[in-house]
Regions:
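Aromatic-rich, lipid-facing transmembrane alpha helices and their immediate juxtamembrane interface loops
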Residues: 1-230
Length: 230
């Protein structure tokens, strides 16, 4: 089944989002969430490799109209890659301020979208589309393998991993920004992209990110200081 996520926004949306991202980084530094910030940057780079390198160059399924493809996809990847990975990492941290972080991110997304619609009439329109039929099966396989690893660990091991909690993070983070795009009119009014993307796209990485998080946080605190040896 072909699901084609599409977005339409103006150039002001990009610039406002860059301001939001800079503000987000400043807050992360101020609150000493250093590892979350580093993971966010790496997540943005990963998104760019996938979106530009695979979807655009290798498969030709990514289409950008009204902007330079390289720069636009670099911004999109760093924007949603950084924000998603930071948000997920803070959830995995079981950060005591998870609600505040979540509200900050969601309110920021909504604010950027609506401000750009109010004041961006003089900026050019940008449209992005992405076909999925050539790779959603591979994504589903990656998702299956990841959760299978956690399931096998639970079956064989003494320590029980909270798989429903990990699954909820993977689905809800993607659903949240898909919903913001939908209600602000940036995403076309279709239900399948939000359903399929929420179940697969961010969620496929959660088992692996959980294992990475657990390995790192055994040795380091969020501010990069060493944890005492157990």
């Amino acid at each position: 089944m072909e699901v084609i996520p599409a977005r339409e926004f103006n150039g002001l949306f990009v610039w406002l989002d860059v301001v939001f991202l800079i503000f987000f980084v400043i807050i992360l530094i101020y609150t000493k969430r250093y590892i979350a910030g580093i993971v966010g940057i790496l997540g943005g780079i990963l998104y760019f490799i996938v979106d530009y390198g695979i979807f655009f160059l290798a498969l030709g399924t990514r289409v950008v109209e009204g902007a330079d493809t390289f720069l636009l996809l670099l911004w999109m990847s760093m924007s949603y890659g950084f924000t998603n990975f930071v948000w997920i990492w803070l959830w995995l941290d079981r950060d005591k301020r998870t609600f505040e972080w979540s509200l900050f991110i969601l309110a920021g997304w909504i604010c950027v979208a609506l401000l750009s619609q109010n004041f961006g009439a003089s900026f050019g329109d940008i449209v992005t589309t992405r076909g999925t039929i050539r790779y959603h099966g591979v994504m589903a396989l990656i998702l299956f393998v990841g959760y299978a690893i956690l399931i096998i660990k639970n079956i064989k091991g003494k320590e029980k991993i909270n798989i429903p909690w990990i699954l909820a993070i993977g689905i809800l983070v993607q659903f949240a920004w898909e919903a913001v795009l939908l209600v602000t009119g940036i995403r076309s009014m279709e239900t399948m992209p939000i359903i399929i993307n929420s179940l697969i796209e961010t969620n496929l990485g959660l088992p692996y990110l959980f294992l990475i998080h657990r390995a790192i946080m055994k040795k380091r605190n969020e501010d990069l200081t060493l944890r005492p040896a157990e």
